[in-house]
């Protein structure tokens, strides 16, 4: 998951992908690095189809809602924001004007703020709509509300892309907690003893494959809007054009 490109291969890159994961509990059957693995998998499959380059991932982020579980490690939102802004600035200095944050963790709310402030130089992917479309394309039986964490979607993606990382037990680990109105204040603990919120028993490699294919296909629209933002910014001073809303402000698909 660490890119091995040479400096020469990077010369003509205009768009970079920064996978942003987490290091947090995912129940007894998925690894702490699940969100990072998913973000990297999405980014790598995108890079096979579009003219972009994948950066090394951010592996620790904002997982404070999981603080009660062993192994979970977090950084502050301010630190994550600073890392993203520093990476974007460094890329611009190297001639790469655009950065897409490929997030595998829904708790990284600050990524949306970084994108909002970037004046069209960043995008956040996947957004809520892309995740929901991926669920539909894959025939997921669990809704996005119910399938919050270590459920059908995440387990399916790992069963497809990295089955060696899925330990036995997911078939009997279903747990639903749709009413999570105090999650930000109280964290995950009041809603699950195992760390799972969802129905991993319904996961399959085929669903993971189809979900990823949907996400890769959807990225083309996000890339086109990001490029259009750049054109609007270059022309705006002369023609009064406005930036195009690409929906980056929407919430992410999981936790």
Predicted regions and their residues:
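Extended, histidine- and acidic-residue-enriched regions that form the cofactor-binding/catalytic faces
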Residues: 1-98, 104-237, 253-255
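Alpha-helix boundary/capping motif
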Residues: 236-251
């Amino acid at each position: 998951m660490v890119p091995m490109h040479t400096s020469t291969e990077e010369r003509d890159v205009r768009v970079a992908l920064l996978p942003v994961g987490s290091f947090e509990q995912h129940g007894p059957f998925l690894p702490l690095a699940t969100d990072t693995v998913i973000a990297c998998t999405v980014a790598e499959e995108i890079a096979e189809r579009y003219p972009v380059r994948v950066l090394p991932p951010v592996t620790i982020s904002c997982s404070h809602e999981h603080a009660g579980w062993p192994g979970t490690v977090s950084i502050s939102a301010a630190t994550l924001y600073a890392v993203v802004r520093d990476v974007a600035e460094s890329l611009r200095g190297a001639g790469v004007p655009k950065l897409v944050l490929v997030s595998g963790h829904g708790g990284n709310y600050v990524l949306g703020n970084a994108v909002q402030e970037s004046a069209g130089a960043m995008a956040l992917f996947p957004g809520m709509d892309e995740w929901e479309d991926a669920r539909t394309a894959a025939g997921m039986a669990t809704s996005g509300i119910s399938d919050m964490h270590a459920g059908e979607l995440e387990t399916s993606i790992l069963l497809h892309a990295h089955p060696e990382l899925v330990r036995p037990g997911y078939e009997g680990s279903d747990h639903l907690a749709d009413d999570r109105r105090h999650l930000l204040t109280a964290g995950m603990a009041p809603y699950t003893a195992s760390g799972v919120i969802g129905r991993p028993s319904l996961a399959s490699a085929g669903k993971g494959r189809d979900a990823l294919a949907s996400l890769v296909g959807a990225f083309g629209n996000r890339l086109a809007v990001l490029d259009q933002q750049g054109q609007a910014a270059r022309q705006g001073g002369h023609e009064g054009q406005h930036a195009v809303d690409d929906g980056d402000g929407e919430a992410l698909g999981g936790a």
